[in-house]
């Protein structure tokens, strides 16, 4: 507890002697009660005063008629001319602005190199992440291909890489598994829409006059979720509600990604061991999965285990070398592609699937499947799941685009980014794709290899197109354990966030707690619940910060007019009889009692002083033989009008962002309590919003507007001048009247 809390004016009627409340004999019994300051004697025209008041004239506010405002907005929006149409089209398709101005000599080499490298990295990652989403490998390649082209058309960031993303694939996979489980166990063999065959559950689609097996139904679910996520993102862009992302702080997003990374690692562990286990969903899926793994550990496929260990021994050190020598290497070593090629050749020629029952990727078709609309009947089942997926997708995309734009000195439009990522989901959902977003790891690679514009995304899509048309079938023998290793190794960045915790703790303990809560809930409960818990806990922390604000008494620096906290800085002095109080938070219904109790504790409690005066006066009445007429309480207060050393309380409102009704009532109550014992209350450095609230709340009358000041120095000077005008001086801590 600071020394400020031990104020000599914190009075109590029980622990202070009666003599402390004695009144000087010359004090008239009929002293006039009321406001402690006669404001009429301090009119601005009074030339006798040394004090000079600052006056600032407000701009006239325009008429805020809602109907007229809406009509003006509509007229402005509905105006149509050639220039406006052109600007709207160019804003919606940013590529039309920058592509005609493209500097071929300056940018083409960097764009081609970065696009080629990112495309090479995306091939194995797209195949691996498709398994995470419960899809066939070809759908991961489709997703990255279409996302690259569409972001090229709609995006405003020059550097981010948009494509398949592990966290979103995990969330898609959980929805896919849940819907498959709902469709297959509860089979009605008499139904015309679902039938059970010996090889599993098959869904009949009458509109296509054909059968839809597990793989077909899984991509229907995935594409429907993707479509809904894109619709939400475009809607948020249209209604300009990008502010939602501000509730996803850096600490929350980092904790969520790290927690989800544990879930991803857990889901891929079975591939590393070659175990065939059902996927666990719902609350506690991580714990349930590990229980299943340890129960079946004796069924480990030795071939898959050895392959996984060899891949880890190659990938992990190479990733570290790429990171260590990134400033010296012209491009990162494409270790993942090398491992995929080597593992595929070893599996093919070693016949690992036939000889050791090693699980492989299987047939990957070439070319493109015919476009197909999402399954509209699934929308009610997945609409809620798509909300969390859409928010995470656009939050990561917008934050990365703004981060790299700031780094390279250009601007991005957040709402256009939401349109871009939304269309990266809506359009590909008709081409058997799953949800996409920007990814930090690939964006860093793209930037470090010389990317200048989004033309590099076209180069990336050409690499993926080559794989889709020619190379994809060659991955038939690729072991799934290799894909699992690639997925786990790419979690390295998220898992290494633990190294940043000591620094985060030193910077902000609250952010560290938010990180831990979000991470643990995402890992131990589920990704959706973890995100919800993180957002709710962050909001609670914001409220907690306003409910427990920083408070301090201010002192004056000797050689300036700067007021700062006495408990923080040395060599500050307080003006005699004046207390300057600072409250660093908005004043509203949640913290009104905190404000009041802190103010009374730091300065003087007027309620206790008034009670002590009454108590002392009643005892004094019993001893006096004088006959008083009138109300006993009135007489008590007249008798006990004890002069105090403190005559003014100045409240520094510079850190009070806003007031609500409860806050205004609290200020009125505080002022009334202090003026009842002869102490004036002044407000200084109120922002225009606070001044407007005080005026609307009738905090002071028209003639009392002098109680509001633009600076602390002005308020303190006014307080000193008012005491001089009253003819009151302070001697040995007692105020003596000059009357």
Swiss-Prot record:
Processing after translation: N-glycosylated.
Carbohydrate attachment residues: 205, 357
Name of the featured protein: Sulfate transporter
Keyword Heme included in the entry's annotation: no
NCBIfam families according to UniProt: sulP (TIGR00815)
Alphabetical GO biological process terms: chloride transmembrane transport; chondrocyte differentiation; chondrocyte proliferation; sulfate transmembrane transport
STAS domain location: 568-719
Protein function: Sulfate transporter which mediates sulfate uptake into chondrocytes in order to maintain adequate sulfation of proteoglycans which is needed for cartilage development. Mediates electroneutral anion exchange of sulfate ions for oxalate ions, sulfate and oxalate ions for chloride and/or hydroxyl ions and chloride ions for bromide, iodide and nitrate ions.
Keywords: Cell membrane, Glycoprotein, Membrane, Phosphoprotein, Transmembrane, Transmembrane helix, Transport
Residues modified to Phosphoserine: 12
Domain of life per record: Eukaryota
Membrane topology per record: Multi-pass membrane protein
Tissue and organ distribution: Cartilage and intestine. Expressed in the kidney (at protein level).
Residues annotated as transmembrane: 112-132, 137-157, 227-247, 255-275, 378-398, 420-440, 455-475, 524-544
Location(s), subcellular: Cell membrane; Apical cell membrane
Gene from which the chain derives: Slc26a2
Catalytic activity of the protein: oxalate(in) + sulfate(out) = oxalate(out) + sulfate(in); sulfate(out) + 2 chloride(in) = sulfate(in) + 2 chloride(out); oxalate(out) + 2 chloride(in) = oxalate(in) + 2 chloride(out); bromide(in) + chloride(out) = bromide(out) + chloride(in)
Family the entry assigns: Belongs to the SLC26A/SulP transporter (TC 2.A.53) family.
Entries under PROSITE patterns matching the protein: SLC26A (PS01130), STAS (PS50801)
Presence of the UniProt keyword Nucleus in the record: no
Region (Disordered) location: 1-44
GO cellular component, one term: apical plasma membrane
Pfam families: STAS, Sulfate_transp
A GO term, aspect molecular function: bicarbonate transmembrane transporter activity
Organism of origin: Rattus norvegicus
